[in-house]
């Protein structure tokens, strides 16, 4: 989780809830005004389970909103193993900390005013997902979808991929 972020957005959002797949480095994230158990449960169901199926395991920090009754019941329902990262040692969960840092940096470079950062979050995620990760030697997009992403710039300027298929 990233936040609280100041200033809060036009719609009152102050937090970014982040999930990362350890193998592909794929990141899912959403912005929220508050991060309660109900918000975390909805995020896991809507943004993770409904898109990719239930994960085998999730690792969260030790905050109550990630470890309460609703989350325990969710994990039991979907047969998800739930464990916690080491308390007071964020470096032990390095992949998440690195992803959080990178997402924050990308958002900071994209925002026009700091109150619109929530509108830049999808674009920031796209930039993160289509950048090569040194740990895998590939982009998260390629590892998840098995193909290269079509970049927004390629819509305006035809890429070599397009030219090869025409010739």
Question: For each predicted feature, which ranges?
Answer:
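Integrase module of LTR retroelements
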Residues: 1-167
């Amino acid at each position: 989780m990233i936040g609280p972020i100041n200033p809060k957005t036009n719609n009152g959002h102050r937090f970014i809830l982040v999930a990362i797949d350890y193998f592909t480095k794929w990141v899912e994230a959403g912005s929220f005004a508050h991060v309660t158990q109900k918000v975390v449960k909805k995020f896991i169901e809507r943004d993770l389970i409904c898109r990719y199926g239930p994960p085998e395991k999730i690792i969260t920090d030790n905050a109550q909103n990630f470890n309460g009754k609703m989350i325990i019941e969710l994990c039991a329902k979907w047969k998800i193993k739930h464990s916690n990262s080491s308390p007071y040692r964020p470096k032990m969960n390095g992949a998440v900390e690195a992803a959080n840092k990178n997402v924050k940096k990308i958002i900071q470079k994209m925002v026009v005013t700091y109150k619109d950062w929530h509108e830049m979050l999808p674009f920031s995620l796209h930039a993160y997902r289509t950048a090569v990760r040194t740990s895998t030697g590939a982009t998260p997009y390629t590892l998840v979808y098995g193909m290269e992403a079509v970049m927004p710039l390629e819509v305006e300027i035809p890429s070599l991929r397009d030219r090869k298929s025409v010739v």
